[in-house]
Each structure stands twice: as structure tokens, then as C-alpha cells.
Swiss-Prot record:
Modified residues (Leucine amide): L81
Disulfide cysteine pairs (residue numbers): C50-C65, C57-C70, C64-C77
Record keyword Cell membrane present: no
Record remark on domains: The presence of a 'disulfide through disulfide knot' structurally defines this protein as a knottin.
Protein name: Hainantoxin-III
Propeptide: 22-48
Any further remark recorded for this protein: Negative results: has no activity on Nav1.4, Nav1.5, Nav1.8 and Nav1.9 sodium and calcium currents.
Tissues in which the UniProt entry reports expression: Expressed by the venom gland.
Function noted in UniProt: Selective antagonist of neuronal tetrodotoxin (TTX)-sensitive voltage-gated sodium channels (IC(50)=1270 nM on Nav1.1/SCN1A, 270 nM on Nav1.2/SCN2A, 491 nM on Nav1.3/SCN3A and 232 nM on Nav1.7/SCN9A). This toxin suppress Nav1.7 current amplitude without significantly altering the activation, inactivation, and repriming kinetics. Short extreme depolarizations partially activate the toxin-bound channel, indicating voltage-dependent inhibition of this toxin. This toxin increases the deactivation of the Nav1.7 current after extreme depolarizations.
Highest taxon in the source lineage: Eukaryota
Length: 83
């Protein structure tokens, strides 16, 4: 019973996201949706002077915020795990 309720709720959420995506014509839809859901606007790199998760960066320069490192392979800031 709990599993069917969870699946029904997950289906409704998925239907909402797909419906919203089909109406949206902006190219930055995924980031916009995450911004609205998790209020990521407070964490944009322009406001804090350093680059956050997923922002493009140049390896060797210390552009990423603390706890993030510039990936030399992908050239974007990712979580630094200390390895």
C-alpha cells in the first residue's frame, strides 16, 4: 500500500515536471527548475566572488569556492573530496 502511494505521488511529480518542461521555451530550464525548487539563487557565483558547483573554471587557478576544486578533465567546479 505504501509503495503504491509513493509510486502514484512520484508519477504526479514526474507528470508536473514534464508538463512544465513542455511549456518552457528557455534553454536553461533544468537550472531554472532547480533554482525554483531549492532556491539556488542565493548561491550564484556572481554574488559571492567565487565559482560554485557546476560553474566553468580554469584548472590551476583558484576560482572555485572552498570545498570545491576545478576538474582538469571537465573544466568545471566539483566537490573536493580530499583525495
Amino acid at each position: 500500500m505504501k509503495a503504491s502511494m509513493f509510486l502514484a505521488l512520484a508519477g504526479l511529480v514526474l507528470l508536473f515536471v514534464v508538463g512544465y518542461a513542455s511549456e518552457s521555451e528557455e534553454k536553461e530550464f533544468p537550472r531554472e527548475l532547480l533554482s525554483k525548487i531549492f532556491a539556488l539563487d542565493d548561491f550564484k557565483g556572481e554574488e559571492r566572488g567565487c565559482k560554485g558547483f557546476g560553474d566553468s573554471c580554469t584548472p590551476g587557478k583558484n576560482e572555485c569556492c572552498p570545498n570545491y576544486a576545478c576538474s582538469s578533465k571537465h573544466k568545471w567546479c566539483k566537490v573536493y573530496l580530499g583525495k
